[in-house]
Amino acid sequence: AGHKCGRMHGHGFEVILHADQDLVGRALGVDFDRIDALWAPIHAELDHACLNDLPGLANPTSETISAWIWARLKPQLPELSWVTVYETASCGAHFDGSHYRIWKEMTLDSAVRLARAPAGDPRRRIHGHTYTLRLHLHAALDQVMGWTIDFGDVKTLFAPIFTRLDHHPLHELPGVADNDTASLARWIRAQASPLLPVLDRIDLYETRGCGAILGWAEDGPALP
């Protein structure tokens, strides 16, 4: 009661459909035109619509939307393996027919120095990055709230760690092996796991496309 998400609001949702490819039994792995055709009527239902009025979407969280899409698409597209729903650019949910996963993304502006970089390498000097950090969590759906974990709760629980990272020199952190993204991701896991026990993957990028993925779940790093 009283949660802001209980008030009428809207999002620019985006959806990714993941499909397994049979590269042995077919000449064509995935027929994208077929996926477009199957998606078109679902898109027509969802686009510019009050989602709460659609049967099965009385509580349209990113988790319930991903399951709703799965239920309509899977019978027609057996290759469907995951449905991803972006609620905003920085958070969303995945559903594979059985399990829900969510992620929360944030940025960090931090100073770093790589002690183990080769002699003469400029990365041994103090420099900085605007890091992109994405936390992935795997939990059961709360049937009352319609989500696994409130994105706001993830942000609040992670806040003490975020405060230690953002606008700070990371080379001064106690217990961090070095300032490469893999070492930093391992440090973040050690600090965050007691606060977020359902955390099972950390993505940390120092620049776009350059970083580390640390995962300890069965699904591996295939999902975005």
Task: State the predicted function of each range.
Residues 1-224:
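Charge-rich, low-complexity N-terminal segments
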